[in-house]
Swiss-Prot record:
ATP binds at G225, V226, T227, G228, S229, G230, K231, T232. GO terms for biological process: DNA recombination; DNA replication; DNA replication initiation; DNA replication, synthesis of primer; double-strand break repair. This is Replication restart protein PriA. Residues 472-640 form the Helicase C-terminal domain. Component of the replication restart primosome. It comes from Haemophilus influenzae (strain ATCC 51907 / DSM 11121 / KW20 / Rd). A motif (DEAH box) lies at residues 321-324.
Amino acid sequence: MKIVRVALAVPLPRLFDYFVPDDVSLQIGMRVLVPFGTQKRVAIVADFPTKSDVPEDKLKAILQPLDLAPLFTPIYWDWLHWAANYYQAGLGDVLFQALPVKLRNGESAVKNDRTFWRITDAGKNALKQGELKRSKKQAEALQYLSETDLEKGNNDFSSAIWSALKAKGFIEEITIQTNPLSWQQRLGNNPIVNAENRLTLNKQQALAFSQLLFHSGFNVWLLDGVTGSGKTEIYLQYIEEILKSGKQVLVLVPEIGLTPQTVQRFKVRFNVEIDVLHSNLTDTQRLYVWDRARSGQSAIVIGTRSALFTQFSNLGAIILDEEHDSSYKQQDSWRYHARDLAIVLAQKLNISVLMGSATPSLESINNVQNGKYQHLVLSKRAGNSTALRHFVIDLKNQNIQNGLSKPLLERMKAHLEKGNQVLLFLNRRGFAPVLLCHECGWIAQCPHCEKPYTYHQHQNVLRCHHCGAQKTIPRQCGDCGSTHLVTTGLGTEQLEETLKTLFPHYSVARIDRDSTSRKGKLEGYLEDIQQGKSQILIGTQMLAKGHHFPNVTLVALVNVDSALFSLDFRAEERLAQLYIQVAGRAGRADKQGEVVLQTHYPDHPLLTTLLANGYQAFAKETLQLRHSMGLPPFTFQALIKAQARHSDLAENCLSQIADFFQSKQITGLQMLGPMPAPFSKKAGQYRWQLLLQHPSRMTLQKALREYQQAELEKNSQVRLILDVDPQDLS
C-alpha cells in the first residue's frame, strides 16, 4: 500500500496520512482532494512515508489528484519549509498561504484558455439610445466594453452587472485559446525603458549604483537615503539592469505605500509587463497575476507583504522599499516578517535584495555593522529641496484645544494664509496610554521598576507591565498636586471637527483607515491634495511616507508623548522613524518647510538627540542602550498570547505554559509574565501574554519546538498565538 502524507489548512500543527490508489500518480507539491471528517478538503502532498502510525485498515484513500505537476519549485518548497520551522507554524498554514485563494479552494491551476466579455450590436445600440440611464453601473460597464474586451472575473465590475447585461443580450462571452508569451517575447524589439524618463544620477547615487552592479549573486544591500535623496531612481535603474539580463523583479512596498502614483512611475519608465498585487484585488485577479509571474509573462510584480509568495520562473532581484515599516510583519494567521523571509528566499535563489529606507530599522543597522548587509548611503536631498526648520512646542501649561496648542494654531494660520497646505499627523498604533500631569509633566510610575504605569480603561486601573503591580487612578499629581491629569492619545475624528470649527474657510481632509476603507477613496483624497482642493490634511501612518505634496510647507506631530513612555521598547524607534518620514512631507519642492513637534517633554533624550544630530545619531545611542539592557537585536524574543472570554482562563493557560518552560531550566531564558496585554480586552476577549527572551536564537527555537511538541493540556475556550520575533508587544 502506497501512503501519502499531506498538509491541510486546519488549525492543527501536524500532517495527515492517506493511501494512494494504484492507478494514481502523485508528486510532492501537488494538490489532492481528501476526505476529512464529514467534509472533502484540498490538501498538498508533503511526503511519501514508508509506513504510517495509523493502522492500514483505518487509512482513507485520497479522492483525486487536482494537479498534473507540483505547484511549487524545489527552491520555493524548501523555502516554505524553512519558514514553517522558523515561525513554528503548521506546514499546511504556510503552504496554503503561498497559494492564491482560488487554488486553495481546489480550482485548476492550468489556464489553457481565457473568457472575455464582448459588447454585442444590441449593446452598442443600447448605448446610443441611452437605454441604461436608470442603471448607472450597467451603463458604465457597457461603455467600458465599447472600448475594449474585459476578462471575465478580472475587472472592477460585479458579476451581477454582467449577468444582467448578458440577460438583456447586450454582451456575450468569448473564449480565447492562449499560448502565453514571455515578457521578452511581448517586448519584441522595443526598448525596455523609455530613456527620456531616466534621470541623471548625482555623485552619491552613481557611487551606490556602481557598487550594486559590481557584485553578483546573493547580497543584501541597505540603501540608507534621506527623504528625497533619490532612492527610487536607483531602484528603477537597478531594475533596468536586471531586466536586461532577461530576469524578473519583485518589488515589495508597505501596504499603505502602494498607491497609483507609485505604480504609474514604473509604467511610465518601463515598456515591459508590470503586474500589481494588493488587498483590493479579486481572487480571480490574484490567480491571474500568480499565473503570469510563474509562467514568465510578468517582468515586474509590485506588491505588498503577501506578494512575496508569488512564484517566478526566473526571479533576478527583490526590491524592498521602506524596509523598516512594521506592516511587513504579518499580524494574524502565522506571523512571518516579509523582509526577513525575502532575504532567506534571495539566499536560496542566489540573487540580491535591495532594501531602502530613510530610517532603517535598528536590526538592519546592526546587520550592517556586523557585515551581514552591504551599506549604501545617500545623505543629500536630490533636486532643489530646501532645508527644513524644526520647532518643538512645550505643551506644559499651554491652553490646548483637542490636542492643538496656541503656538501651533498660529503657525498653521500663517502657512494657510500664504496659500500653502498643512499636514497634522497623529499616530496611536501600538502606543500604550500613560497618565501624566498637564501642569508639570509628572508621569505615574511604578515605584518598583521606575517604569510608567499603563492606563487600562476597561478596569480603570494603572498597571505595571514589568512586574504586574497595579494601583487605582490617583486624583492628583504626585509632584505638584494638580488635579489636571490626562491620558495620552487623541482621535483623528475629534481633531477633524475641531479644525473645521477653528478654520471654517479652509477644506479639511482626514485620511486614515476608516475614511479610506472604500475602494478609490484614498486615490480621490490624494488627487484633491495635489490639486489644492484640501488645505488642512489630517493623517495617520498612511501619509507618513512615499507621497509627494509640493505645497505642504508645515507638518506637525500632534501627540508623541505616549511613545516616549511606552512599555514597548520599539516605540521610541518608531517615533523617530515617523518623525523623519513625516518631516519628509514638508518642503519637497522649492518652498521652505517647517516641522513642529508638540510634547510635554521637550528635553527628553530621544528628542534632543534626534533634532540636534539626526536619525543616525539616535540609532547609534539606542543600539548601545539596547545592548546594555539585553534587548533585540542583541537577544531574540517570542511572544505567546492567550485570548478568552474569561480573564482567568487565559491567565491559567499561560501559567501552565510558563511552568513548562520553567521546568526545562534553560540557562539564559528570561520570561516576562503571564500578564494582561497592554490593551487587555478587545472585542469581548481578555488578552494575556507571556514574553520569552534568550541571547541565542537557536536555543530559543529549540525551546519553542519542545513546547509545541509537549502534551500540554488544551482548553478549547482559549485561543493561543505564537509570535516569533514579535514587532508589537501590545
